[in-house]
Amino acid sequence: MTILIAAAGTGGHVFPGLAVGEALVALGVAQDNVVFIGGRRLEAEVYPAAGFPFIPLELAGLKRRMAPSNLALPAVVRRAARAVARILDERSVATVLGLGGYVTVPAALALRRRPVPLYLAEQNAQAGLANRFCSLWAERVFTSFPHTAGLKRQEWVGNPIRESLSAFDRSALRPIAKQHFGIPDDQPVVGVMGGSLGAALLNRVAQQLANTKPAYTILNLAGPAHAHEQARLAAAASSPWIVRGFETRIELFYAAIDLVVARAGGVVAEYTATATPAVLIPGGFGSGEHQWANARAVAKTGAAMVVSEDELERVPALVHDALGQRAEMAAATATLARPRAALDIAEALLKEAGP
């Protein structure tokens, strides 16, 4: 029995896919029987490094603006769908999970004349184009937010997160986390986390916060490409400002902080699962207004404050206000927290796949 997972492109698709793969293995599926497909981007590094079989496809995503490359897209998708069909036959695939993005469409098309069920997982409060299209013949769509617009046959389970966060205990990890980062015990800690697309702007926010000489420590995950320059600025700052390029033990980052300033992609599931209040700066990049939809959904519960990229001067005041309300905001995260999402999806896939 093989389960095929189509998750590619950005970390917002790749890491939830990996979380489901790890949950399947935890439930007894042999790792060689959890096969990932994608392009030659982040997924081509992440899945093999985690020990999973990975089969690259020659494909590309749709550009939202008029671009000559879009003219070739139908032929590219057809070729990729034929490649997926061969994988389905050669591997005796029992069920397929697509996590949106450009790889989901050829995977879904390959199933249209086969008795193999398709499941989808949507990471955002507003469904992406690929999942909206593929949901027309999916058995079920697992959503990260309740009442996700644009999808039929949806079931709210939450966004799959890493195993290290699914049983997160801040009080138990806090002393280890503070020692890990070298953080003093006498101040609150504000985490500033920039993803691959948002790092430059979030790093400017970290600089802005440091310039206010705050009564808190800044823990800045700057991204590998920005870490050296941020560390240089932090060394010259008069405020406590700790810089890391990347943190493999992400549970220690969340355990160390009292508040996160970050983007609002699918990673918001990590904020709610770890009961971390947030000041969210939604990005305007990518497909549609997904980050704004996510940010509004979290803010509606009282777990986050939201500010646009055009109003970054408001961030220090919002951080001050959020720290003063952090107990109430942390409690509000429970409204959306679904730390068992990866296991729930894995169990549903196994039930469908049968013995």
Task: Describe each region flagged by the PLM.
Residues 3-8, 30-76, 157, 308-310:
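Conserved nucleotide-sugar phosphate-binding/catalytic loop shared by glycosyltransferases and other
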Residues 93-95, 247, 255-268, 276-277:
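Acidic donor-binding loop of glycosyltransferase active sites
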Residues 327-339:
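A short, well-ordered alpha-helix in the C-terminal region of glycosyltransferases
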Residues 321-324, 338-355:
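C-terminal alpha-helical cap of glycosyltransferases
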Residues 35, 112-175, 180-183:
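Active-site-proximal region of nucleotide-activated glycan assembly enzymes
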Residues 301, 306-327:
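C-terminal "capping" alpha-helix adjacent to the active site of nucleotide-linked donor transferases
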Residues 66-95, 113:
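An amphipathic, basic-hydrophobic alpha-helix
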Residues 44-46, 173-179, 183-259, 292-295, ...:
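Donor-nucleotide binding loops and adjacent catalytic segments primarily
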